[in-house]
Amino acid sequence: MIALFAAALFVAGGTARACDTALLLAVDVSNSVDEAEYRLQIDGMADALLDPEIVLALTEGRVTLSVMQWSGVERQVMSLPWRQMLTKADVIRFSQDARALERAFVLSDTAPAEAIRFALRQFDEVEDCARHIIDVSGDGTPNSGSDTRGASQEAERAGVTINGIAIESMGVAISGFYRRALVTRDGFVITARGHRDYPRAIRIKILREVSRVVG
């Protein structure tokens, strides 16, 4: 979740180009997410990237994307490394690769603080970008790991924005936790009413994030 940077950027293929935004999409694959819900998240993300408005904003803004999966304390992995979206073909290829991702972890806890800290380290590869954003999706509150608010404050000190998609389920108030402890002060939360609402929510969120790049 980030916008505006103009500098030499890491791109697939090793070429340095100007980039406005580095956006890291962090997908929750903890124990509360079953296989069908995982597919809803992955397919929803892949579909959202192909939305014509989002394709235009990504390419005009020279946005650089990556995808990570996260769950417990030592359960984070970069599933798709940083790639810059210079053309529609770049976006289509990234969407296809995202849709093909296999789930990285199963039967694991929920540790968003450790996910945030892992994500922060990834921005070393795109440090010249003007704005850095972590886009966290999840359907649960922490049951392992360190204090989430502390990790969010570390992101603020590093100049990184955290936005969130809170996937609500019956009797679990995820949106309030995200607003209180996870997103940064310049960030925002989009609520998905269950995993089936996730495709709508992620489209809105990505469009809001990358549209800031092109006005």
What are the residue ranges of the model-derived segments?
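Second-shell loop/turn segments in exported
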Residues: 26-36, 65, 81, 99-109, ...
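Von Willebrand factor
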Residues: 19-81, 85, 92-137, 163-174, 197, ...
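Sec-exported extracytoplasmic/periplasmic mature domains
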Residues: 43-54, 103, 120-128, 142, ...
